[in-house]
């Protein structure tokens, strides 16, 4: 007695098992988290260290190199990159996916703490954070007021909003864009300082000595103990202005005599506006692998709670929210599930033309789909685009077994058999075929388990959900379906009018198919040239179809990065960015929001469009219009960017090609030639390189002999320049219970030309004032403003956007050609960002494709105990793949991970249909029929079930192939590949 017979004999048992599947599936659905994609973020740890006033070369040698040297030994590192720039070093450590984030963070902290003894004493301690320093924020809260200054808004954002949001689970950091943090600015006048014989170092020492509060002990009496507190801290600009610096001829010299103190912003070279209104933005950056929707929901909840804490004249809004696209995309896929379900039911009814027979698959489909959520739950997955796509694909797959089982039982009932016996006999005949098709479909997805990197993580969840759905549907088909069939199906004495009207069509179809099959079986040799033609078509089209990681999606967001020539002032880049902002306003006046942000050297404009349903143009069209328009804005450079599907880095182009060399001189020599070839290549647009050699600098060459003779040391000179010009922190002060910086610097009006520096004085060891011009020589030069390392090599990353119609695969091929023409054997090349993910996913998907073919062949061989029968089935695979490629080429679909996974699915779908015919043919041969007759009978008998299941699969995927709304392009890619492959293969499969 098999499980089908047991279920027929014990219907309550079969019903209970089905209810348990439904119950567990519903519980799983209600407890699963929601996100856009499976967690595919590599663990990334960032190390930052500040050293005010130091240039890139000093930062690289004294900070970056010691830190990198120690970090490099940590196991599991995928890439180690760094940037050394004026006053700061940033190191990004990317680990393999298998490494735990907390373990990685602890390892990095340990290595950084060991390296600290090699760092300069007066640099800030390095900070370690669990996120990429360039990670994209998922949400921005805009804080605005008509009556308050940006200083006040920044304080509210910091003390009220940021404090609350950074405690949300899985948030890596909360930053304030456009922040004007309070500081005590000490503006120095070099002329007055020279007159009073005071240097910037004297001011620093006075601050250190006069702004201090140390523990002072206590007074202990017999009955009372009093704690002493020395009130040495200063809190107001007036107190700082009154600091006594020295006494000259009986006259006290205060700070107000050589400058002035004011409460002002620490960062005076930045601003931020949203829709033209100055504001500050609180942005939330998630940890790698975090659930973005849960974080966004928590932010909304916290902001609602904070309403009562904000002043009445302070308003907040959401500048952007990336989770809107995620929610809409998931909702679109969910609606696709319902559409697919309805279409599948319609096709089943059109074929069976009996509501009782149709009712059985209608009941079985939800069992398999709901059960899939239990598979997600026990595997620790989430509801995301890929798991929901798996559910959509399952609609067409899970119905197959139910249709085949129901149809086989129904035929026997129509022949006069009692439902009970028909159920047992029909289930027994089809039992092995159902098991075989299930194993075959599951085997298709087994290779995905072995895939590494981003693509492996992405489609592991997809494959498990499809495989789980198919296994559950197979179980339901072998238990619940035959039981239902024996209860619902009856022999009709007279068929309904719809059946009678349509039966001639099906009988005619059978006759035409029988004639075609007989004709082809007499000319079986034609199968070989047809297969060869299809293989040639595959070879040609595979090379013609452009490849990329994932199709670009309309996320209703565009970003424009602006950059000026090296050495350009903050005001210059600010004016250029505002010019681009005005241009954007003229091109898309109905944008939901336009946020402009500028800091020294660069700017960014983030455009948030209306929802897709509220506009009649696409994000890509707007991006192209802006790209064309900004070409006329030549004062500086602007780069239009659109976020990739799997990109998490801010401001990164799709093509990221890294050149590595042993010395910066070699890079300086080859970069101009390399870049000129990239600029001339029509594949690229908006190309740029991060390593520049054109930043103007003034080198101070010290005459050591002269300085020594006059009693001045190199430290005296360096500290005077450091505290006078770099904006170095001189200490801290407290206001409203919070700590802020004290920043000293010479007035900008008195340090805006090289000649101003010559008038600065230093004090010798004899107490004499010496003009700096007497000890040093000023030489104008150029140097890189930023120095880059990639995997410990000095590097330069060439970034490029892609011309309209070009893909990342074509871009990387062109980069490889340029590198071969330009670089010698001492150079290395590497990929970064989306380019690296694409290259890794391409190789692993090809491996999965080949392994799927081998596994299915071996499994079929084991099932049929023959190496020949599986080969017959496998010959139909090229038909499906060729069909998929033809439809993709005609529809302009790229070869991406979505279309490729659809092609891998086709292998199982086509093999499944082949099993049904070959299995029945073998059974008939065992029953005594000759080979050719067995083939004819099996093909004719399985014609309707195969057409029905194939049509169900195709119609179940039609909503994907014609998808609209958020996330449509990836659904179209997968749907087109599977639908195209099924349509072409079914035309030829039933004959071949």
What is each stretch, according to the model?
Residues 1-31, 430, 498-550, 607, ...:
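Signature of alpha-helical transmembrane segments and their immediate interfacial
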Residues 6, 37, 48, 90, ...:
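Extracytoplasmic/periplasmic membrane-proximal domains and adjacent transmembrane bundles
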Residues 12, 19-55, 113-123, 377, ...:
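Transmembrane helices with small-residue packing motifs
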Residues 24-36, 342-411, 418, 450, ...:
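Hydrophobic transmembrane alpha-helices and their membrane-interface caps
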Residues 34-45, 81-87, 122-147, 175-181, ...:
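Flexible hinge/switch segments at interdomain interfaces of large molecular machines
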Residues 58-130, 191-212, 233, 571-653, ...:
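Solvent-exposed, membrane-proximal periplasmic/extracellular interface segments of envelope transport
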Residues 319, 326, 330, 406, ...:
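Helix-loop junctions and hydrophobic alpha-helical segments within the transmembrane domains
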Residues 395-409, 431-450, 457-499, 605, ...:
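Transmembrane alpha-helices and their membrane-interface boundaries in multi-pass membrane transporters
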């Amino acid at each position: 007695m098999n499980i089908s017979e047991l279920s027929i004999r014990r219907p309550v048992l079969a019903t209970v098992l089905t209810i348990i599947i439904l119950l567990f599936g519903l519980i799983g659905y209600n407890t699963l988290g929601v996100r856009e994609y499976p967690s595919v973020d590599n663990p990334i740890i960032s190390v930052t260290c500040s050293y005010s006033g130091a240039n890139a070369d000093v930062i690289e040698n004294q900070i970056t190199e010691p830190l990198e040297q120690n970090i490099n030994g940590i196991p599991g590192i995928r890439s180690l990159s760094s940037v050394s720039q004026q006053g700061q070093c940033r190191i990004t450590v990317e680990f393999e996916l298998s490494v735990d984030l907390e373990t990685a963070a602890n390892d990095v902290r340990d290595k950084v703490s060991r390296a600290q003894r090699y760092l300069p004493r007066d640099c800030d301690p390095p900070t370690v954070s669990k996120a990429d320093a360039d990670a994209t924020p998922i949400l921005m809260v805009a804080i605005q007021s008509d009556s308050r200054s940006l200083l006040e808004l920044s304080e509210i954002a910091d003390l009220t909003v940021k404090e609350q949001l950074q405690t949300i689970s899985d948030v890596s950091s909360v930053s304030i864009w456009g922040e004007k943090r309070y500081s005590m600015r000490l503006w120095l006048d070099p002329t007055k300082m020279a007159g009073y014989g005071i240097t910037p170092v004297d001011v620093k020492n006075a601050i250190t000595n006069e702004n201090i509060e140390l523990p002072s002990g206590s007074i202990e009496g017999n009955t009372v103990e009093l704690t002493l507190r020395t009130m040495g801290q200063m809190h107001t600009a007036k107190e700082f202005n009154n600091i006594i610096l020295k006494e000259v001829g009986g006259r006290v010299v205060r700070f107000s005599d050589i400058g002035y103190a004011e409460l002002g912003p620490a960062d005076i070279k930045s601003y931020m506006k949203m829709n033209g209104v100055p504001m500050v933005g609180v942005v939330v950056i998630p940890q790698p692998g975090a659930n973005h929707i849960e974080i966004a929901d928590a932010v909304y909840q916290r902001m609602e709670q904070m309403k009562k804490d904000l002043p009445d004249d302070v308003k907040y809004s959401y500048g952007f929210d990336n989770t809107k696209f995620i929610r809409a995309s998931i909702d679109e896929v969910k609606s696709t599930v319902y559409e697919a379900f309805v279409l599948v039911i319609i096709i089943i009814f059109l074929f069976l033309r009996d509501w009782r027979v149709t009712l059985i698959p209608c009941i079985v489909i939800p069992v398999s789909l709901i059960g899939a959520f239990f598979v997600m739950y026990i595997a620790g997955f989430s509801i995301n685009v890929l798991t929901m796509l798996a559910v959509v694909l399952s609609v067409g797959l899970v119905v197959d077994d139910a249709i085949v089982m129901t149809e086989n039982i129904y035929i026997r009932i129509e022949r006069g058999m009692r439902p009970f016996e028909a159920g047992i006999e029909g289930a027994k005949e089809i039992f092995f075929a159902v098991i075989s098709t299930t194993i075959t479909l599951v085997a298709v997805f087994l290779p995905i388990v072995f895939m590494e990197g981003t693509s492996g993580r992405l489609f592991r969840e997809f494959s498990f959900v499809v495989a789980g759905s198919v296994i559950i549907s197979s179980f339901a088909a072998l238990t619940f379906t035959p039981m239902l069939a024996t209860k619902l199906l009856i022999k009709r004495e007279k068929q309904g009018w719809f059946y009678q009207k349509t039966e001639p069509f099906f009988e005619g179809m059978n006759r035409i198919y029988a004639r075609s099959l007989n004709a082809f079986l007499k000319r079986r040799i034609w199968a070989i040239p047809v297969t060869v033609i299809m293989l040639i078509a595959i070879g040609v089209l595979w090379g013609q179809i452009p490849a990329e990681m994932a199709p670009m999606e309309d996320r209703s967001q565009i970003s424009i990065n602006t950059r000026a020539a090296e050495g350009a002032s903050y005001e210059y880049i600010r004016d250029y960015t505002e010019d681009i902002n005005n241009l954007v306003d003229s091109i898309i006046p109905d944008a939901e929001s336009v946020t402009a942000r500028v800091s020294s050297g660069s700017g960014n404009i983030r455009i948030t469009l209306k929802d897709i349903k509220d506009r009649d143009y696409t994000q890509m069209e707007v991006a192209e219009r802006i790209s064309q328009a900004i070409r006329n804005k030549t004062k500086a450079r602007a780069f239009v960017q659109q976020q990739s599907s799997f990109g998490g880095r801010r401001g990164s182009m799709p093509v990221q090609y890294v050149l590595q060399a042993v010395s910066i001189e070699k890079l300086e020599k080859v970069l101009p030639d390399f870049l000129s070839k990239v600029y001339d290549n029509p594949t690229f647009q908006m190309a740029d390189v991060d390593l520049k050699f054109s930043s103007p600098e003034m080198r101070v060459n010290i005459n050591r002999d002269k300085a020594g003779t006059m009693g001045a040391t190199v430290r005296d000179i360096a500290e005077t320049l450091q505290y006078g010009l770099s904006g170095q922190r001189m200490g801290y002060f407290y206001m409203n219970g919070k700590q802020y910086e004290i920043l000293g610097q010479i007035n900008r009006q008195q340090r805006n030309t090289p000649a101003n520096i010559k008038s600065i004085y230093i004090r010798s060891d004899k107490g004499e004032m010496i003009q700096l011009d007497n000890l040093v020589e000023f030489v104008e030069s150029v140097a890189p403003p930023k120095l880059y390392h990639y995997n410990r090599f000095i590097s330069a990353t060439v970034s490029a956007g892609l011309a309209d119609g070009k893909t990342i695969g074509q871009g990387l091929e062109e980069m490889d050609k340029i590198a071969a023409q330009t670089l010698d054997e001492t150079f290395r090349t590497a990929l970064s960002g989306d380019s690296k993910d694409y290259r890794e996913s391409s190789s692993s998907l090809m491996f999965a494709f080949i392994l799927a073919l081998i596994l299915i062949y071996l499994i079929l061989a084991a099932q049929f105990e023959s190496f020949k029968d599986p080969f017959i089935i496998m010959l139909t695979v090229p038909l499906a793949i060729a069909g998929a490629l033809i439809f993709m080429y005609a529809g302009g679909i790229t070869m991406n991970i979505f279309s490729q996974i659809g092609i891998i699915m086709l292998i199982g779908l086509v093999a499944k249909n082949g099993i049904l015919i070959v299995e029945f043919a073998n059974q008939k041969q065992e029953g005594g029929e000759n080979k050719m007759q067995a083939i004819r009978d099996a093909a004719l008998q399985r014609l309707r079930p195969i057409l029905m299941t194939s049509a169900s699969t195709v119609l179940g995927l039609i909503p994907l192939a014609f998808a609209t709304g958020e996330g449509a392009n990836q659904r179209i890619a997968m749907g087109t590949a599977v639908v195209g492959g099924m349509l072409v293969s079914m035309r030829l499969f039933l004959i071949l």
